Amino acid sequence: MDATLDRFFPLFESESNEDFWRIEEIRRYHESLMVELDRIYRIAEAARKKGLDPELSVEIPIAKNMAERVEKLMNLQGLAKRIMELEEGGLSRELICFKVADEIVEGKFGEMPKEEAIDKAVRTAVAIMTEGVVAAPIEGIARVRIDRENFLRVYYAGPIRSAGGTAQVISVLVADYVRRKAEIGRYVPTEEEILRYCEEIPLYKKVANLQYLPSDEEIRLIVSNCPICIDGEPTESAEVSGYRNLPRVETNRVRGGMALVIAEGIALKAPKLKKMVDEVGIEGWEWLDALIKGGGDSGSEEEKAVIKPKDKYLSDIVAGRPVLSHPSRKGGFRLRYGRARNSGFATVGVNPATMYLLEFVAVGTQLKVERPGKAGGVVPVSTIEGPTVRLKNGDVVKINTLSEAKALKGEVAAILDLGEILINYGDFLENNHPLIPASYTYEWWIQEAEKAGLRGDYRKISEEEALKLCDEFHVPLHPDYTYLWHDISVEDYRYLRNFVSDNGKIEGKHGKSVLLLPYDSRVKEILEALLLEHKVRESFIVIETWRAFIRCLGLDEKLSKVSEVSGKDVLEIVNGISGIKVRPKALSRIGARMGRPEKAKERKMSPPPHILFPVGMAGGNTRDIKNAINYTKSYNAKKGEIEVEIAIRKCPQCGKETFWLKCDVCGELTEQLYYCPSCRMKNTSSVCESCGRECEGYMKRKVDLRELYEEAIANLGEYDSFDTIKGVKGMTSKTKIPERLEKGILRVKHGVFVFKDGTARFDATDLPITHFKPAEIGVSVEKLRELGYERDYKGAELKNENQIVELKPQDVILPKSGAEYLLRVANFIDDLLVKFYKMEPFYNAKSVEDLIGHLVIGLAPHTSAGVLGRIIGFSDVLAGYAHPYFHAAKRRNCDGDEDCFMLLLDGLLNFSRKFLPDKRGGQMDAPLVLTAIVDPREVDKEVHNMDIVERYPLEFYEATMRFASPKEMEDYVEKVKDRLKDESRFCGLFFTHDTENIAAGVKESAYKSLKTMQDKVYRQMELARMIVAVDEHDVAERVINVHFLPDIIGNLRAFSRQEFRCTRCNTKYRRIPLVGKCLKCGNKLTLTVHSSSIMKYLELSKFLCENFNVSSYTKQRLMLLEQEIKSMFENGTEKQVSISDFV
């Protein structure tokens, strides 16, 4: 075994331990990953040594842990070893940041100037806090500078957002710590500078977004007391209107990075910052106490056990994405606590039947939710309750299976209740949201039954048996027969009781009996509110399960009243009058609306290229290389000769100038040349020897593209049968080194597209899964055994495809569409190896099944560290299932975000830093380092709060009834963080709810299948009318005010201020040139904003106003806007008249 794996298993468990087999499986699994990674790395290194890429070696270094990732990211030799020593010494992550920063400034990692050392120290601290995964340390901190007035400035940039609030504040704290060590003074702002901050931060909130906007008093308190000058690069085009041109502020534009650090960092994370200050013992931060007291606790209202409806999730409503439930409204989703094997980690579980009826909610669709967090990805959970509906014939039916939903969908008239929504305790803990009353479900009831001495499976019992258990064992009424008594008023209860007693009758036939009630509209409404299933036949309401119902009404089997009604609310009355315990069925409803639709699609740039090779304007609007090879600039010009900005390299052997790493003539490695635009001279230094200006590694020069293309086709042995090969208009990298044309030709052949870094990627919505069935993912038991899965999650030998198996942390289940794309990529890689690198093929894949067992890289857009994964199967959903640890290693949760997969060999062969854009944020979304082994201790801490138990204890459910803090229950519910001290952190996780199939429900949301906005809005409003928990008039009002009106007004403003664009070269003009055409290419100009973009939502807005109860104010706004649009675009009716008409 690789010695580096010893760190993950410091203790060898004895074979007597019942989990020994699990840990052994994980050991072998990690070893197999490392062996395969090493094999593929060697192949890639051999290919790279041929000199056909921008570098001679693979450009994705391997890191086996957080310490190695940080070292490779910061390029400090010996840093990884030191971090591991400090970790083994028991230091917290925060203290390690300060210790390492201290040692960097002291020169223990190499002597460097004071300013550079402080810069490295601050960046390294952020890298340690973010596990070396995100790009924030290199992209989010632009620079650190010692001001001439002897104080420290830290310039933040937009990508600092990806670090999160805690890492942002630690950068400020570490900067202060090393400032003191370096004997640099503190920052003392002027009154004008303080007021500049007070204006600029709210302005950033307007033009961008902030989670939290501090008050002017809080901003003043932070800025006037912070010993570091929190500065930033200008990130927005907006400028401040006051306090401009200040001597010590370098820009009038908004500095996004600064705003983020002060608002989402110091202001929002003040309590955490105070804790770190106390732990490290830094003086001068006593003012944090005033900030914490002044800022208050954003959750303080909810801590008072008064949980009010929250409509924040409705504030940014989008047309075509339906509201499923208004805040905490009857008929909305009923909260059920638990974690299914495919849920948790910011997801919400929904019954597949609910998904099918709603149409807009598919597997992976994002729901914006009322609580506990902001959003969650949808997963199917068949073991929770589905919706209750009213059919067109009046029947009320509970639909719990997908087959029932499919059979009844056309008959549904109204959705009375959306069913249950499964949210795990860990999400409440992560969001620090008070626990709200749990629905009365089987997992709660069975624990009360066991407490009373009952044993056995009572999941499905008859009504008679349920009542017998209540009478004999004094257990509460079974959840199946507990109705929503708390949802009706005392008056409704009295009316219902009297009506049933006076007018009802019990009729029996063939051993079955029913309760018949004469049809009464008020009784019908009350029964629907109770969610009591019944049928409407002729003029009668027929109730088949009636015994528990009449018992709760205080009636005997002859429908005679047993006793009188007394009590403050219906539930109290029911408990008193029935003689049995009846729990509240569903006190907590969760409001929700559709967020982003699910996604599983290949990554394409806009427009999508096949190769990173510049063609300038020669390729036309499509950047087509086939057009460019036939391009002639003038009558006498050479065909296929284009002029582009491209790298300058020179062969030291034969002197030929080229842009490749290896000379095409003599095979020698070329040297980089630099060009000075001022002196127009080439030299070997990056600084001009004449004028001292920084030179560029590229210049604009002629390239014989036709010759290069013909050579590439001949080299590959391909026929020139390609219609289109799309390149790029120009390279955005520092030296503008292009890809070899052979790669683009082969990508076109296999239908593969290239991303900015040279890789081919597939994007998919993130979904979690800890356990799977072989049948669900299309893999045989034999293949799974080959991959190291020998037992199911309970320890039994793996024999059939329906056993439940625990997923290994780095195994992924790809969407089928993703597997098909990666199959094309695999074939492209094999062709590349054989025809371009002259090596043996690697994948030899004929079908998607051949990809099982192969390694991939997972990467999130805001990070710079890929995570090694292994394909073990495929699911017919538009999302990617993977272990929560895998997602957390990418610093993601599963609330609806999407990440990408790429084949490992594609990344190792084709990725190059030389292709990355030379701009702020250019190194984000690039695998600058690869995490080989995922250690749960070193992933995003959110997953540490995920619960891993088989059931929540009775104490938990009782605690929810008193709105307990989730922290009170930490000792009662085992979580991932309780396992971090030993090997059991990798395996042996459990779940509370099973599901029939992880792909059940809807595959594609109606939002994606409906093509026009008109169809989407019509269906959205149709659904709003159908769902009892939705106020369709409020939805119409919000859609107009939040989406349509701002869009129309914005486009109307943009139309009057628009630029004009050349249809050929894309050059934009603020005013039309006097010649009336493009000054560069002579082509015609067109508008950039068209009248159709202004008018597109006008008719839809009028439809909503006419058909729904929209406020008069909104109607008048729309009417005035329509008049303004007509005055701009519609001419009055013209009529030819003669002078005699005026006589």
Swiss-Prot record:
GO MF terms held by the record: DNA binding; DNA-directed DNA polymerase activity; single-stranded DNA 3'-5' DNA exonuclease activity
Role this protein plays: Possesses two activities: a DNA synthesis (polymerase) and an exonucleolytic activity that degrades single-stranded DNA in the 3'- to 5'-direction. Has a template-primer preference which is characteristic of a replicative DNA polymerase.
GO annotation (BP), single: DNA-templated DNA replication
Keyword terms: DNA replication, DNA-binding, DNA-directed DNA polymerase, Exonuclease, Hydrolase, Multifunctional enzyme, Nuclease, Nucleotidyltransferase, Transferase
Catalytic activity: DNA(n) + a 2'-deoxyribonucleoside 5'-triphosphate = DNA(n+1) + diphosphate; Exonucleolytic cleavage in the 3'- to 5'-direction to yield nucleoside 5'-phosphates
The protein's assembly and partners: Heterodimer of a large subunit and a small subunit.
InterPro entries, per the entry: PolC_DP2, PolC_DP2_cat_dom, PolC_DP2_central_dom, PolC_DP2_N
Protein's name in the database: DNA polymerase II large subunit
NCBIfam families: polC (TIGR00354), PRK04023.1 (NF003103)
Family: Belongs to the archaeal DNA polymerase II family.
Pfam families per record: PolC_DP2_cat, PolC_DP2_central, PolC_DP2_N
Assigned EC number: 2.7.7.7, 3.1.11.1
Species in which this protein is naturally found: Archaeoglobus fulgidus (strain ATCC 49558 / DSM 4304 / JCM 9628 / NBRC 100126 / VC-16)
